[in-house]
Amino acid sequence: MNILITNDDGISARGIKTLAEKMSKKHNIIVVAPREQKSASSHSISINIPIKIREEKIEGLDCKAYSLVGTPADCTQAGISLLAKGIDLVISGINRGFNSGTDILYSGTVSAAIEGALYDVPSIAISMDVKWDRDDEDYSKAANWVSKVVDLAEKKYLKKNVVLNINVPNINEEDIKGLKVCKIGKSTYKTEYVLLEEDNDKVYQTSGVRNQVEKDESDLYFLSQGYVTLTPLHFDFTNFKELNEVKKIFE
């Protein structure tokens, strides 16, 4: 297949290099990623702003690669519409840290995959838990899992309007219990604001403590139990359970 690989951690991130190396063994790949770190940029795109694109060379990879001054969703757009032809699959990642629960609403990684689905291209987002005090993570187990999913999806399940969101726990590969297909859980943050300076503007540094809600059958729960999780996502936010009741009240 012709696969577009992107992320939100940037073109120099370890995760995207590991993913590209793994996928290039069986597929034709092109890498289009942000030039700088763009985590938590959600589904933002560049409007009325020139987009700069530069060809890059990723060590150890013999494929076309481009860095883009813009957002992860911009990268997917440019990859599909400008830099490549006939893309069969978009894979976004491997993200440094989970994109599970309601964190997916903030995620540039997931949004880059959803952008692919908006263009009618089957898409996958892949993320791995990390130890945040380290920057030498080994993403090979996440690459192995996404490769398994791609192999099976190519044979049995490639749908143009569906994103497969995969999360891999940060445990030894032999200790992973398997893969669970499940719904997303709910996770919120208690945000704290620390005043750094006060002049014309008050300048704050924010930090967040995660209030993780682990419910049975959710990705948050299964990740805590040592499973890889896979959740099918769609860009339609319609609350269909409430649609008829809201119609009765407001129409």
Curated annotation (Swiss-Prot):
Cofactor(s) annotated in UniProt: a divalent metal cation
Where does this polypeptide localize?
Cytoplasm
Question: Could you tell me the keywords of this UniProt record?
Answer: Cytoplasm, Hydrolase, Metal-binding, Nucleotide-binding
What are its GO cellular component terms?
cytoplasm
- Give the EC class as a word: hydrolase
Q: Which Pfam families match?
A: SurE
On cofactor binding, the record's note says: Binds 1 divalent metal cation per subunit.
Q: Which domain of life is it from?
A: Bacteria
Q: Give the E.C. number(s).
A: 3.1.3.5
Q: Which reaction does it catalyse?
A: a ribonucleoside 5'-phosphate + H2O = a ribonucleoside + phosphate
Q: Locate the residues binding a divalent metal cation.
A: 8-9, 39, 95
InterPro entries per UniProt: SurE, SurE-like_Pase/nucleotidase, SurE-like_sf
User: Main localisation, per the record?
Assistant: cytoplasm
User: GO MF terms on file?
Assistant: 3'-nucleotidase activity; 5'-nucleotidase activity; exopolyphosphatase activity; metal ion binding; nucleotide binding
What is the annotated role of this protein in its UniProt record? Answer: Nucleotidase that shows phosphatase activity on nucleoside 5'-monophosphates.
Q: State the family named in the UniProt similarity comment for this chain.
A: Belongs to the SurE nucleotidase family.
Name under which the protein is recorded: 5'-nucleotidase SurE
Q: Which organism does this sequence originate in?
A: Clostridium botulinum (strain Eklund 17B / Type B)
